[in-house]
């Protein structure tokens, strides 16, 4: 398997109590099954990582999205972004879906912000990039997106 065809997982752990970041980079076309590549399937992976590592954020996007994100000094939304904050549609109306973490039945400690719930995020789709960019701008306007320096 070529490295360009595989997913990338970056987990940054330092002397703090929890990892400052988890980034999941997806190839442009994933070799996994449709279920594994679905919004629901990837959100389950993010939720599981959050329950184990309690990170400051988790970002899920193709590698090619990085130069297209709005802010160089903050995490990008890409396909999904987990933040350890309870967020509402009133705060982030541009989000196509907000998934509470943990799931129903337990106290919510964070939110997975989804830019594209019905397809795999693609930088070749201008609408996907535009939605992710609008979410990033909204989060910064509301002081909800931390800078890397603050993580």
Feature-to-residue mapping (PLM):
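Internal, hydrophobic cores of structured domains that mediate oligomerization or house catalytic pockets
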Residues: 1-64
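C-terminal interaction module
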Residues: 64-151
């Amino acid at each position: 398997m070529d490295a360009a065809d595989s997913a990338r997982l970056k987990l940054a752990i330092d002397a703090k109590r929890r990892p400052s970041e988890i980034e999941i980079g997806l190839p442009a076309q994933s070799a996994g099954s449709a279920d594994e590549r679905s919004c629901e399937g990837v959100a389950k992976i993010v939720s599981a990582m959050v329950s184990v590592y309690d990170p400051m954020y988790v970002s899920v996007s193709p590698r090619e999205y990085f130069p297209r994100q709005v802010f160089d000094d903050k995490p990008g939304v890409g396909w999904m972004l987990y933040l350890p904050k309870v967020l509402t549609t009133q705060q982030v109306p541009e989000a196509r879906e907000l998934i509470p973490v943990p799931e129903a039945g337990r106290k919510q400690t964070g939110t997975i912000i989804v830019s594209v719930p019905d397809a795999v995020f693609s930088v070749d789709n201008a609408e996907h990039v535009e939605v992710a960019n609008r979410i990033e701008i909204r989060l910064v306007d509301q002081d909800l997106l931390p800078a890397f320096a603050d993580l």
